[in-house]
Amino acid sequence: MSDEIYSELTYGAEHVTIASLPGMRERTILINGFSKAYAMTGWRLGYACAPKIILEQMLKIHQFAIMCAPTTSQYAAVEALKNGDKDVKQMKESYNQRRRFLVHTFRKMGLKCFEPFGAFYVFPSIKELGMTSDEFAMELLKREKVAVVPGTAFGSCGEGFLRISYAYSLEELKHATDRLARFVEEIRKEKGLI
């Protein structure tokens, strides 16, 4: 099973679906949707590509477990597939600009931040600040009114990291990172890290 919801939002090398590899098409269930690449969040539209025998079994479950998607949503999805490539390309370029901005900004703050190659999130490290991810997120929200997701929301290995979305305007990201930089500077002073 290959969840390819972010397949259109990759940076650098183009996405390669596992189903395109020799011998994999007949053994792959590919899952995708419209929420990420076509910005159709909340429409709850998705699709699966798989060998016919598997799709027939999936249909048996689907038709009794889930009601049909509204017709207007289905028409919108068809329109997105037919004519949305230009919009996806523009959105990807915009995300890429914001991605580069955030990575650069966190590194400028002295925080390690790996460059993501897909989706629209960065995962900077705050380990050197001597706070847990939850403490950092709560204190940042309290002091600077900036919300981030603690890395621990994604498991214990996320401790010491934050997840930050760049699905916002560059102007909003600049405003938020100015506040975040001020907060990081204050924490360093309070903890004697400067």
Please annotate each region the language model reported.
Residues 1-194:
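PLP-dependent class I/II
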